[in-house]
Amino acid sequence: MAGETSFKYIVRIAGVDIDGDLKLPYGLASIKGIGYTTAMAVIRMLGLDPEKKVGFLTEEEIRRLDEVLRDITQLGLPKWLYNRRKDYETGKDLHLIGSELIFYARRDIEREMKIGSWRGIRHKYGLKVRGQRTRTTGRLGMTIGVRKKR
């Protein structure tokens, strides 16, 4: 049994259930906070085969991936690949994944709203934040459309 490789249909990496049929980069990209490019960089740094399916990973490879994904900064990847550079409180370059990423994003929006910045005000009123037009798009409710005359 030692030489036999078993296929797992669902693999848990970084607290996320990943479909075993996916190739490694696409499987890792299904984790929130990790895109295809970051996944490929991590795979190359660990010396894994990008064509390998997630279900064929050994327990040791899963453990190594899990360990590295908890702190991607230890791999020495370029800073532009991180998703949180120059953190507001610490000033450090971080790479967040999963619920931690959601928590930090929500906290940033709350801070913007509290200080009363333009972005914060737009968020507070539920309007578009990034300069999109609002005259015709982004209307909430009012979905009657055209009514036939009786």
Curated annotation (Swiss-Prot):
The keyword Transmembrane helix does not apply. One of its GO terms (cellular component) is cytosol. GO terms for biological process: translation. It comes from the Archaea. GO terms for molecular function: rRNA binding; structural constituent of ribosome. Keywords: Ribonucleoprotein, Ribosomal protein, RNA-binding, rRNA-binding. The keyword Ribosomal protein applies. Located at the top of the head of the 30S subunit, it contacts several helices of the 16S rRNA. In the 70S ribosome it contacts the 23S rRNA (bridge B1a) and protein L5 of the 50S subunit (bridge B1b), connecting the 2 subunits; these bridges are implicated in subunit movement. Belongs to the universal ribosomal protein uS13 family. Part of the 30S ribosomal subunit. Forms a loose heterodimer with protein S19. Forms two bridges to the 50S subunit in the 70S ribosome. This is Small ribosomal subunit protein uS13. The gene is rps13p.
